[in-house]
Every structure is written in structure tokens, then in C-alpha cells.
Design a protein with these regions (language model features):
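Transmembrane helix-boundary motif of multi-pass solute transporters/channels
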Residues: 30-146, 247, 256, 263, ...
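Terminal cytosolic tails of multi-pass membrane transporters
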Residues: 1-42, 417-441, 459-513
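Membrane-interface loop-to-helix entry segments
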Residues: 165-220, 251, 274-278, 402-415, ...
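Transmembrane helix-loop boundary segments of multi-pass membrane transporters
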Residues: 65-76, 143, 152-164, 185-196, ...
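Hydrophobic transmembrane alpha-helices that form the core helical bundles
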Residues: 62, 87-174, 179-182, 330-347, ...
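Helix-loop-helix junctions that connect adjacent transmembrane segments
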Residues: 31, 76, 155-165, 194-323
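TM-loop-TM module centered on a large, flexible mid-protein loop between adjacent transmembrane helices
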Residues: 108-115, 150-155, 227-229, 273-340, ...
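Helix-loop-helix connectors at the membrane interface of multi-pass transporters/channels
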Residues: 9, 107-118, 141-168, 202, ...
Length: 513
């Protein structure tokens, strides 16, 4: 039988919501003392996932690929369809988050939901999540560095970007994001609030200027236009690859789950943060996608440019206004990386707390001054920088290494959802749950993750060369092989899954804050 953990609730006082959650009691029931401060309100929890998904950063980074893999038809209708499927994933994850609101999130819930081999399920989920998040931090920093260089090149035409400069700028960005995460979680919460408004106001500015300023817009029927410039003769295959644009954007919403131990009323606010961030991102992203699609003037010129969304801005708004829009995009990317690093450090903190990482005692320690896992922050920074370094010599090498980002995260998302489905009626939900819709939505989520994971690992351009080869399956295989060898060599004897520090009354006495 699987372990069943009820969600402790305080008695509701007169006039209050009957679901009043005692956050500390919930954490103690799961075997953990309180070491982090609860400064995240509902909006803050939503903000971190909304910032990591970051529709401005995601769409501007991948729009060009979509123009050649399906064109407007897949960019728009693919966005709608994939958004719905991702919302199913988020809803299924949210149900699990309500039952197990801990920083460990995916790996913790996998260990608790597994009937057998709890340690193994938890181990592989944790490492997929860790590697995916590290790759996300590195890739987002690299994208921001690339757009910063594009802005500088527009401002000073004599400037010629180099790979060395890109790596150095990326390193500076990640280190600065590490410094911001070193201070109190209250600062992180404030920055995430600013990020939400930066994204929303930035969206309004970009979309409104694209509506008002260009002399030419495409006709309404342009949304059905199809392009397949992937090099593959099959239009169906090319269109399927175009679905990746939306999937690449919708990652990182587990951030709300990872911030559970720092969120007030986490059993309700964390799942709401997950689902709301996906829902609002889907709507705002569709608006931005339509604005960009209808502002394309010369399709061939834009699709063939090095940065198609930037070319759309230049063609439609003029160079001066385009540079202002580019600053909005750069800001969005910087906020995205900051939030991603925050989520990453909480996963490291929790994974180390359960003894899964080398030097675990070091990484799950909390600063007595800021009440944040400072050492975990700098481990995340160091690992992200290590992934960036190969870009000094080869952009292809960097792309190959970070290609595990999205597929690693989505596979980590699938594990606890699948285990919850396998548990059936034995699963005891928290106060936020899907009721009778839990199982059909969960199966749709697992099936879509399986299908999209295959897409992530298929060839994405033809002819297949060293530069165009999709290294995601190789990167994933390396992660799984290393994790498997490590598991059978030593880990299975020392790591049995999530650790309980004692009875609720015992762990309550260990609270540090």
C-alpha cells in the first residue's frame, strides 16, 4: 500500500473560508521542519511561474523556427491546441501540489505516490528536474545575452558580436541573478511582482505599436497560411515540428510547486499559481502571436533573417521604436532567468535535504540572516555556468548540452502525474483537486507529454548536419545513463526517497523560523 498523508487543516473561524490551511502543520505532517520563511502570497506564487513561462521571452526566442515549421497556421492554431494540453498537465500537477506542498515538488511527490521502488522513482525524477532547470537557466541567460548583443549591434553598427562575448555576457547575467537570489525571499517576491507588470505592460506596448504603426498588415486569411521550410518533404511532419514553439515556451510552471514552503496557504495557492500562470500565459501569448503574425511584411525576408521577430519590429516600427521594444524583450528574459534560478535553488535545497546530492549537508543549509538556501543558489549558478562554457568554442556544443532542458522537465512532470493515476482511489487529494475529472485529465496530460517528448527528440531540420542535428536524445541518454549507474553503484543504498525527520510534534520542535 502506498503511504497516505492527509492535509492538516485548522478549524475555520466565523465568516472565514472553511478551507483554512495550517501551513506548518502540513509541512510537519510530511516530516519536515520549517526552515524557510513564508513571504509568498498567492500573487507571488503565481508570479514566479508566469515569469518563468514568460511569453515574451519564449515567443521571441522561437518564433523564427515556427515561421519555417508550419508558418502562421501552426504558430496560431498550434499555440491554441498545445496551450490546452499544457493546461491539462498543469491541472494534473496542481492536484499533486495541493496534496504535497513541498520544495521537493516533483521528486518528493513521486517518492510518496510510488507503491514500490520509491527511492528509484524519486531519484530519477529529481535528477531530470535538476538537469532540466539548470539547462533552462543557462539557455535563458544565453538568449538574453544574444538579444543584448542584437540591441548593441542596432545601436552601434560597427559592433560585431562574437561567441566569446556572448558567453561572458551570459556569465555576468547568471552571476547577477545569483546575487539577487542570495538576499531575502521578500526581495525575490518583489522582483517577481515587478516582472508580471513588466510582461503585461510590455505586451500591451508591443502589441499596440504593432497594431497602430505599421503601414501594412496581412489579411485575416493569412492566419491559415502554411509554410514548410524545414527541409523535410512531409508537410505533416513539418507542421508537427512547429508545435514545439509552444511547448518550448510553456516550461517552468513547476516553479509554483517548488515555492510551496515559502507560500502562505500553499495547499491552495500553489496549485492556483500553476494553473493561473498557464491560463494567463496562453491568452496573452496568443495575443502577442497574432500581433507578430499579422505584422509580417515580407515573409521570405523575415523568415530568412537571424532574428525574425526583431526584423518584424524593424520593418513595421522603424529602427528607433524597434530598439525600445527590444529593451522590453531583454528585460523579460532577465526576469525569466531570475525566476528560473529561484525555482532551481529550491529544488536543490529539497533534494539535498533528503540526501540525494553529493555534499547534501552543505547545499540544504539556510542562511541565518536571510533565511534563504544561499549555498544552493551558488551551486545552481556554478552548474549553469558550466553548461555555458562550451559555447566559448562552439555554439553547437552549447545547444547540444542545454537541449535536455525541455524534455527533461516534461518527463519529470509526467512521473508524479502517472504515479498518481496508478494509485487510483488510494490517492488522497488536498483541498485543491479535480474531482472526477482528475483521472481523464491526468491521462491526457501523460499521453501528451509522451507524444511531445518524442517530438522534442526527432530531427528538426534537413539535411541533418553537425549544426542542425537534434542532440536532445543524446543529452537525455547521458543524463539517464549517469543517473542509472550512480543509482546502482551507491545511491540506492543511501537514498530511499523523501526522508521524514520524525513525528509532527518532533519536527515542529526543529523549526528554525
Amino acid at each position: 500500500m502506498s503511504e497516505r498523508i492527509s492535509t492538516p487543516r485548522a478549524k475555520a473561524r466565523g465568516g472565514e473560508d472553511p478551507v483554512v490551511i495550517d501551513d506548518d502543520a502540513t509541512l510537519h505532517a510530511m516530516g519536515y521542519p520549517r526552515k524557510l520563511t513564508r513571504r509568498f502570497q498567492a500573487f507571488d506564487n503565481f508570479a514566479i511561474s508566469f515569469t518563468i513561462i514568460n511569453i515574451i521571452s519564449g515567443i521571441f526566442s522561437s518564433f523564427g523556427y515556427g515561421m519555417n515549421a508550419g508558418g502562421p497556421r501552426i504558430l496560431v492554431f498550434g499555440w491554441i491546441g498545445v496551450s490546452v494540453m499544457v493546461l491539462f498537465i498543469g491541472a494534473a500537477m496542481a492536484e499533486v501540489a495541493s496534496a504535497y506542498p513541498t520544495s521537493g515538488a516533483l521528486y518528493f511527490s513521486a517518492g510518496k505516490l510510488a507503491k514500490r521502488h520509491k527511492g528509484a522513482w524519486s531519484w530519477f525524477t529529481g535528477w531530470l528536474n535538476f538537469v532540466g532547470q539548470i539547462g533552462g537557466t543557462a539557455a535563458t541567460g544565453y538568449a538574453a545575452a544574444t538579444f543584448i548583443q542584437a540591441f548593441v549591434a542596432l545601436q552601434w553598427t560597427s559592433y560585431q558580436p562574437t561567441a566569446h562575448q556572448t558567453v561572458l555576457i551570459t556569465a555576468v547575467i547568471i552571476v547577477l541573478q545569483g546575487l539577487a537570489n542570495t538576499y531575502t525571499v521578500q526581495l525575490v517576491a518583489v522582483l517577481n511582482r515587478i516582472s508580471v507588470w513588466w510582461l503585461l505592460i510590455g505586451l500591451v506596448v508591443i502589441v499596440s505599436t504593432l497594431i497602430v504603426m505599421p503601414d501594412h498588415h496581412q489579411p485575416a486569411s493569412f492566419v491559415t497560411h502554411f509554410e514548410n521550410n524545414t527541409g523535410f518533404t512531409s508537410g505533416l511532419y513539418g507542421g508537427m515540428l512547429g508545435l514545439l514553439v509552444t511547448s518550448w515556451t510553456f516550461t517552468g510552471f513547476d516553479g509554483s510547486f517548488h515555492m510551496s514552503e515559502e507560500t502562505v496557504r500553499a495547499t491552495v495557492n500553489a496549485p492556483r499559481g500553476i494553473t493561473r500562470s498557464i491560463g494567463y500565459s496562453a491568452i496573452t501569448g496568443l495575443i502577442l502571436m497574432l500581433a507578430l503574425v499579422y505584422s509580417i511584411s515580407d515573409y521570405g525576408k523575415v523568415a530568412g533573417s537571424s532574428a525574425p521577430p526583431v526584423q518584424i519590429l524593424i520593418d513595421g516600427l522603424g529602427l528607433g521604436t524597434a530598439k525600445v521594444m527590444l529593451l522590453i524583450v531583454i528585460g523579460a528574459m532577465l526576469f525569466c532567468g531570475l525566476a528560473n534560478l529561484t525555482s532551481n535553488t529550491r529544488q536543490i535545497f529539497a533534494f539535498s535535504r533528503d540526501g540525494a546530492m553529493p555534499g547534501s549537508r552543505l547545499w540544504h543549509s539556510v542562511s541565518p540572516r536571510t533565511r534563504t538556501p544561499v549555498k544552493a543558489v551558488w551551486l545552481a549558478v556554478a552548474c549553469s555556468l558550466a553548461l555555458v562554457v562550451p559555447g566559448w568554442w562552439s555554439h553547437t556544443a552549447f545547444t547540444a548540452i542545454v537541449s535536455v532542458n525541455v524534455v527533461g522537465l516534461f518527463l519529470a512532470y509526467a512521473v508524479p502525474i502517472f504515479l498518481r493515476l496508478r494509485l487510483g482511489d488510494e490517492f488522497q487529494p488536498g483541498p485543491w483537486h479535480l474531482g472526477r475529472w482528475g483521472r481523464p485529465i491526468g491521462w491526457l496530460a501523460v499521453i501528451w507529454i509522451g507524444l511531445s517528448s518524442v517530438l522534442f527528440m526527432l530531427p528538426q531540420a534537413s539535411p541533418i548536419t553537425v549544426d542542425s542535428f537534434n542532440y536532445a536524445p543524446i543529452a537525455l541518454a547521458v543524463v539517464l545513463v549517469v543517473a542509472t549507474v550512480w543509482w546502482f553503484a551507491t545511491a540506492r543504498r543511501r537514498f530511499q526517497g523523501p526522508v521524514s525527520y520524525g513525528r509532527p510534534d518532533e519536527v515542529a520542535a526543529m523549526d528554525l523560523v
